[in-house]
């Protein structure tokens, strides 16, 4: 037997957590995610968005959303751009670990849509220009995973 999630979002409730740091990028990711959800049938009133200060704060609010029982999936969006210090490495590692563990802890798909880039240009490319919009891609993944995970509910 083959299990797959379908890409029809009708009836799904989705939470989105967005880091405000680098908002000129994260707002584009959010726009892409909202577009992706709506294009696939998720109603606007079935989408909740929570803004947090930065990427490091994303896992806590994503966990609270996932544990609330209100959502079929949670999308995390943020942008971490390498600077001159090791701060980038710590933030990227902790956010990735934190978000990755949430699906396993909560049984709710939590999608990692956090950009971790070397340059501002790379982030811009992934927020709706050359390399597509990772927010949109995260929305599609959330819909697919929500349906796929329900097959074992």
From Swiss-Prot:
In its keyword annotation, does this UniProt entry include Transferase? yes
A cellular-component GO term for this protein: riboflavin synthase complex
| InterPro entries from the UniProt entry | LS, LS/RS, LS/RS_sf
Q: Which UniProt keywords apply?
A: Riboflavin biosynthesis, Transferase
Any single GO molecular-function term of the entry would be:
6,7-dimethyl-8-ribityllumazine synthase activity
Q: What is its EC number?
A: 2.5.1.78
* Binding positions (5-amino-6-(D-ribitylamino)uracil): 21, 55-57, 79-81, 112
One Pfam family cited in the UniProt record for this chain: DMRL_synthase
Q: Which top EC class applies here?
A: transferase
Tell me where on the tree of life, at the top rank, the source sits: Bacteria
Q: Which Gene3D superfamilies match?
A: Lumazine/riboflavin synthase (3.40.50.960)
Describe the reaction catalysed, as an equation: (2S)-2-hydroxy-3-oxobutyl phosphate + 5-amino-6-(D-ribitylamino)uracil = 6,7-dimethyl-8-(1-D-ribityl)lumazine + phosphate + 2 H2O + H(+)
Is the Transferase keyword given for this protein?
Answer: yes
Where is (2S)-2-hydroxy-3-oxobutyl phosphate bound in this sequence?
84-85, 126
Q: Which GO terms describe its biological process?
A: riboflavin biosynthetic process
Q: Which residues form a coiled coil?
A: none
Q: In which pathway does it act?
A: Cofactor biosynthesis; riboflavin biosynthesis; riboflavin from 2-hydroxy-3-oxobutyl phosphate and 5-amino-6-(D-ribitylamino)uracil: step 1/2
Which residues catalyse the reaction?
A: 87 (proton donor)
Q: Which family does it belong to?
A: Belongs to the DMRL synthase family.
HAMAP family linked: Lumazine_synth (MF_00178)
Physiological role:
Catalyzes the formation of 6,7-dimethyl-8-ribityllumazine by condensation of 5-amino-6-(D-ribitylamino)uracil with 3,4-dihydroxy-2-butanone 4-phosphate. This is the penultimate step in the biosynthesis of riboflavin.
Its assembly, as annotated, is: Forms an icosahedral capsid composed of 60 subunits, arranged as a dodecamer of pentamers.
Q: List, alphabetically, the NCBIfam families matched.
A: lumazine-synth (TIGR00114), PRK00061.1-4 (NF000812)
This one is known as: 6,7-dimethyl-8-ribityllumazine synthase
């Amino acid at each position: 037997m083959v299990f797959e999630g379908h890409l029809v979002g009708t009836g799904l409730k989705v939470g989105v957590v967005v880091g405000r740091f680098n908002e000129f990028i994260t707002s584009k990711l959010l726009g892409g995610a909202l577009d992706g959800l709506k294009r696939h049938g998720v109603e606007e009133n079935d989408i909740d968005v929570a803004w947090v200060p930065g990427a490091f704060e994303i896992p806590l609010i994503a966990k609270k959303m996932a544990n609330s029982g209100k959502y079929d999936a949670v999308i995390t969006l943020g942008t971490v751009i390498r600077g001159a210090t090791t701060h980038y490495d710590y933030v990227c590692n902790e956010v990735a670990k934190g978000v990755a563990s949430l699906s396993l802890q909560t049984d709710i798909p939590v999608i990692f849509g956090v950009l971790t880039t070397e340059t501002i240009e790379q982030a811009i490319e992934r927020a709706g220009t050359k390399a597509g919009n990772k927010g949109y891609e995260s929305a599609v993944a959330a819909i697919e995973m929500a349906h796929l995970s329900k097959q074992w509910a």
